[in-house]
Regions:
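Feature captures hydrophobic
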Residues: 1-123
């Protein structure tokens, strides 16, 4: 894949926010560490404006870590929220940070998934 990491992070963030619109107004700084070939690339994602920069993100409330190849493959295959959840459960990706933000995001995502399930059941 020829796209740079900043573009891929933007694509992934927009996909998650499109799938879980309740997260769109959240004001949050996320640090993203992509590990690969002996180095780590660090990025800063500022929400809600989705500003992605190559930066240490010292003010991040949440930090995401994963292998660069894994992240590229997830974005390339249009990963959905359920795919990301599996990645976190199986240890391919790791999230750390302020517990209140982590719990809030998990609750919002779970509610959205429940809404999607009930919507499908009605049809």
């Amino acid at each position: 894949m020829s796209e740079d990491a900043k573009t891929l992070i933007d694509i992934a963030a927009r996909a998650v926010l499109d799938e879980v619109p309740a997260l769109k107004p959240l004001t949050l700084v996320v640090g993203i560490d992509l590990h690969g070939r002996g180095d780590t690339q660090q990025f800063r994602l500022q929400m809600p404006e989705l500003d992605v920069r190559k930066d240490i993100a010292a003010d991040a409330r949440i930090r995401l870590e994963m292998r660069r190849e894994f992240f590229n493959a997830m974005v390339e295959h249009d990963a959905r929220v359920a795919d990301w959840r599996e990645a976190f459960i199986h240890g391919h990706a790791k999230a750390t940070g302020v517990e209140q933000y982590m719990r809030l995001i998990v609750n919002v995502v779970e509610r959205q998934e429940e809404r999607n399930r009930t919507r499908k059941a009605r049809h």
